């Protein structure tokens, strides 16, 4: 398995929808984010009558023998509420045993830098222990605790005039894996991810509140040694019925890595083809796959100074996107303009 190829695709899915054009926190589009792979607490899903998922299931076929092992990795974003506080009185240092007196504000300009309330994200991944084909089932619960931190904001006189308050809510997920025999040396592998985070009074809560207790952009990476996964898109004829019986919920697995190798499955909330790749013309994450890279880049280049000022204040990822675009050489922009590529072969066009 070429880990770099798989991780490039996985990271593109992980941050799809993280920030949408026009890349400003104040835009309407960015008040409704993270529609891919969001698993809400079970109680909130029930309150929303299933319109918000709490469960993701991957099913695929694995061929192997007594020497075959496989690994299960779940990756997602954990949202962090970022609030901005303005101190009532400037301080030299933050107190160590309590919080200073402050009030929350939507934005705060400190030393020419804009700080604004937002939802940041932390990358998370959890793994089951390496399994073999003798294991009928494996279940593991993962818990991430609630945390709250304060980051001081200093003015040009080195006085603390504000704080960034970051609050991460508790998340509890259960990952289970089941193996069943399809035929000699062929097995059905079922991996379920469930959000079992306690979430009281769910019927009165907003989606934004629920997202803080959710796994976002959730996806599964399956890898095997001494075994082979079967393509669900183009299975061999003798396994077509077994593939059709696979039930995938809120996700779909495809072969990933070097084309032709069958040791990795990437199960994504965004439907992909086998062996997905990042285009050579791509210069980095734009977070908005619903748009064309060239058009997004040109739009960023034409933002006003005020719009760029707000964009820089979102977070480091968005600031890096702006800086990368502003410094992009003309030849890189021309590469995005167009390229002739051959069609991938499949059973349908051979």
Where are the language model's segments positioned?
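Catalytic cores of nucleic-acid ligases and guanylyltransferases
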Residues: 2-3, 327
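Hydrophobic alpha-helical segments, principally membrane-spanning helices and signal/leader peptides
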Residues: 1-2, 289
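N-terminal ordered "arm"
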Residues: 3-65
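Extended, highly charged accessory segments
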Residues: 53, 64-350
């Amino acid at each position: 398995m070429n880990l770099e190829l798989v991780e490039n695709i996985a990271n593109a899915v992980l941050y799809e929808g993280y920030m949408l054009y026009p890349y400003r926190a104040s835009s309407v589009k960015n008040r409704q984010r993270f529609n891919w792979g969001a698993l809400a607490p079970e109680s909130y899903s029930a309150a929303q009558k299933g319109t918000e998922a709490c469960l993701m299931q991957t099913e695929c076929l694995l061929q192997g023998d007594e020497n075959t092992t496989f690994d299960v990795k779940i990756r997602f974003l954990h949202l962090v509420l970022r609030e901005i506080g303005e101190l009532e009185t400037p301080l030299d240092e933050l107190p160590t045993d309590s919080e200073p007196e402050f009030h929350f504000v939507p934005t705060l300009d400190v030393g020419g830098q804009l700080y604004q309330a937002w939802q940041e994200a932390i990358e998370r991944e959890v793994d089951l222990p390496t399994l073999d084909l003798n294991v009928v089932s494996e279940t593991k619960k993962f818990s991430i605790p609630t945390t709250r931190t304060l980051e001081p904001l200093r003015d040009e006189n080195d006085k603390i005039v504000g704080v960034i308050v970051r609050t991460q809510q508790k998340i509890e997920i259960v990952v289970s894996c089941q193996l069943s025999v399809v035929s000699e040396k062929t097995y059905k592998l079922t991996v379920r991810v469930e959000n079992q985070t306690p979430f009281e009074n769910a019927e009165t809560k907003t989606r934004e509140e629920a997202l803080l207790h959710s796994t976002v952009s959730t996806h599964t990476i399956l890898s095997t040694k001494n075994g082979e996964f079967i393509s669900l898109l183009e299975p061999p004829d003798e396994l077509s019925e077994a593939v059709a019986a696979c039930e995938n919920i809120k996700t779909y697995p495809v072969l990933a890595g070097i084309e032709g190798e069958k040791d990795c499955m990437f199960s994504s909330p965004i439907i992909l083809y086998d062996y997905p790749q990042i285009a050579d013309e791509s210069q980095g994450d734009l977070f908005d796959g619903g748009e064309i890279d060239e058009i997004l880049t040109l739009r960023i280049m034409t933002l006003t100074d005020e719009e760029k000022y707000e964009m820089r204040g979102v977070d480091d990822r968005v600031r890096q996107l702006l800086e990368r675009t502003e410094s992009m050489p003309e030849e890189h922009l021309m590469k995005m303009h167009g390229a002739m590529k051959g069609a991938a072969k499949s059973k349908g066009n051979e």
